[in-house]
Swiss-Prot record:
It comes from Mycoplasmoides gallisepticum (strain R(low / passage 15 / clone 2)). This is Small ribosomal subunit protein uS13. NCBIfam families: uS13_bact. GO terms for biological process: translation. Residues 92-117 have a biased composition (Basic residues).
Length: 124
């Protein structure tokens, strides 16, 4: 397994796919990194030379990835909550932030249902 930015990427996969194992790198960014490094997308990680791996590392290190990116996202959310914006309020309450409906659905964000017991209707 090759190690890039402290992450082990799988040897037997194509480089383009293997790079997506790093937080902050999707397919488009992986292709951009490989284009800058002038490496074929279809090459397998096990077939890369040490120079090519070093080149990928140097190009990838110019982006905000992994721990730094996670920290930036967390700080952005924290800032929204401190400022008191609507988005921050939704984060604080654990509800969907981007305008989705909550009457039905939104179970992923809200968690398991909390059922409320109804009062029994007394018959006359």
């Amino acid at each position: 397994m090759a190690r890039i930015l402290g992450i082990d990427i799988p040897n037997n996969k194509r480089v383009e796919i293997s790079l997506t194992y790093i937080y902050g790198i999707g397919k488009p960014r992986a292709q951009e990194i490989l284009r800058k490094a002038k490496i074929d997308f279809n090459k397998r990680v096990k077939d890369l030379s040490d120079e090519e791996l070093a080149l990928i590392r140097s190009v990838a290190s110019t982006y905000v990835l992994e721990g730094d990116l996670r920290r930036d996202v967390a700080l952005n959310i924290k800032r929204l909550m401190e400022v008191g914006s609507y988005a921050g309020l939704r984060h604080r309450r654990g509800l969907p932030v981007r305008g989705q409906r909550t009457k039905s659905n939104a179970r992923t964000r809200k968690g398991p249902r909390k059922t409320v017991a109804n009062k029994k209707i007394e018959s006359k």
